Amino acid sequence: MTETVLNQGYGYGIVIGLGFAFAIVMILVTYVLKRYVGEVQDSEHFTTASRSVKTGLISSAVVSSWTWPGTLLTSAGMAYEYGVCGSMWYSFAFTVQITFFTVIALQVKRVAPGAHTIVEIVKARFGQASHAVFLFYALGTNIIVSAMLLLGGSQAISAITGMHVVAAGFLLPLGVWLYTVSGGLKSTFLSDWTHTVIVYIVILITLFVAYTSSVHIGSIDKMYDLLTEVSKTNPSTGYKGSYLTVTNRDAVFVGWNIVIGGFATVFCDPSYGQKAIAAKPISAMKGYFAGGLAWLIVPWAMGSAAALSCLALTNNPVSVTYPDPVSSKQVSEGMPLLYGMTALMGKNGAAAGVLILFMASTSATSAELVAFSSVMTYDVYRNYFRPNASGKELVRVTHVFVTIFAVCMGALAVLFNYIGITISWIITFIGIALGPAVFGITLTLFWKKMNKYGMIIGCPMGSITGVVCWVGSCYKFSNGVVNKTTLNTPYANAVGNFTGLFSGLIYIVLISYFFPNKSDDLNNLNEKFVLGDDATAEEIVDAETEKKQLDRSLRIGIFVSWIIFFILVIIVPLPMYGSKYIFSKLFFRGWIIVIIIWTLIAALYITFYPLYESRDTIVYLCKLAIGKAKAPEPMNYVDAVEVEIESLSDDDKEKKANDFL
């Protein structure tokens, strides 16, 4: 067994010390925004950030939400196992779901701008029974993804520092809980930005050390030579055993499994819906597309730096596992990420690796906490128990659910660890068992002829079909052996993912045609959503969307999403796969240079654009600090009504005033 690179002090220091430090900073920021900028922590602000988040923060939130520990660990494992195409396939495949979800985000802003959760929309259209079905899928995804975030982070931190995995599992969400309870979704956006900036800094350091300053590698050409040499002693499954080719059948299967199976982890996870709801209408499309393209480079660059370094230095005494290669179990756990950073930078590299895993775990966990509490508050508590609950009561309830979930997700992560469930296994399971709800929510938002039975019957039938085909194909491809290991083989996963996702679509369409009902007017959905009675003027006014802008943005979003899909999963990888091309040294130089430039652009955008968009607030706070400005008083509900009335034409003032009052 490989000894831990760092001692337990690093693990506890980062998890507890840094966790509480971030919590204190976020709580302080929340106080400043409340005290000096006039942000009120009402029920609408806690769950939707007053639907006022701008493009830059939406982009950083997308990057943060999709940068799981599994993102960094699994992409590194794929890069170590398959070479240059491993992290490429991972990043390309998972980017597709983000760009397609842009379309969902835009449609939510068009037809249901007053919604608090994406699950609420199903109830507004189809009623209680359909709502209960999709609630099961949304909470199932939310709970499993949350546990997976902590599982990946706690296992990796334990492996590199020796910190007990149970302690890591329960302590990781503690600091997150503190600032999430204090600041709600807005604090999540702010922590997303902070965490993401740090992740980009670590990635850039790793890239430049690997390809410019490392005494063991130090140049692109040296990396090429080392990868060529290691393929002779430890060949890959790719063409001629090379790690410098995209021609690898196993990698293609894994990539397409991610493309299909990954949709459920985005479309069914209410945390992504929360970000769509929180965005300003005109910010949704730009924020999601820019965030998706900025995220794409995170696993690609990290795999190309840390994991390829780990692979290239296999026969060098500096390797953590020298003289042996990294074991298949360690590869499946994503350890090439940490081992590669350790080989490049020693204990400093290992500490940096633990740091970004901590950032990935806690930032995404915060979003999941808010999503769970929002769904439980609005879709369960207010829907089934207290329809007339006040805004203050809803805030108290969200705090309770955030607290409960913070404890439960840690317990589930520990359970997964002890029964031997891996991150890749969980991702596969979500795609197969919960994937049918992808078309359930998509058609709910877009197809007027879909009826409630499509959701009630079609989605569960799709899940059953996917699981049955998954187990059956596992039995066939694994010579009759069905267990948690054989269920995670690429061919069985492919069958389960495809049948689970697309059988759900078929069932929903057939059921909707066999049991037709009156086509719904999707434009009337927003009338069924009720804002909290403590909503401020801005929240009330912003609930009325700019429909013409959104119509145009939706058309652009659909077109761009399909273009990105074809480029990333067909036009770029498949011709390279079919050509059986092994990278030349010149081509590899260009490949790495593109990665470095892309990373720099993404890092600069995510770091500075949110600051640029918030420049007025920053200047205002600076003036407050030197006594040249006065903090406004937050508006109450009566003030909100007056502001709204004044914004209307004279003919509509009396009617609207009566509606509000």
Swiss-Prot record:
Gene3D superfamilies, per database record: Sodium/glucose cotransporter
Transmembrane parts of this sequence: 13-33, 56-76, 86-106, 132-152, 165-185, 197-217, 251-271, 288-308, 352-372, 397-417, 419-439, 454-474, 495-515, 556-576, 591-611
BP GO annotations: putrescine transport; spermidine transport; urea transport
Protein localization: Membrane; Golgi apparatus membrane
Gene Ontology CC annotations of this record: cytoplasm; Golgi apparatus; Golgi membrane; plasma membrane
InterPro entries in the cross-refs: DUR, Na/Glc_symporter_sf, Na/solute_symporter
Membrane topology: Multi-pass membrane protein
Keywords attached to this entry: Golgi apparatus, Membrane, Transmembrane, Transmembrane helix, Transport
Family matches, as Pfam families: SSF
A molecular function (GO) term: putrescine transmembrane transporter activity
Role: Involved in active transport of urea.
Similarity remark: Belongs to the sodium:solute symporter (SSF) (TC 2.A.21) family.
Listed name of the protein: Probable urea active transporter 3
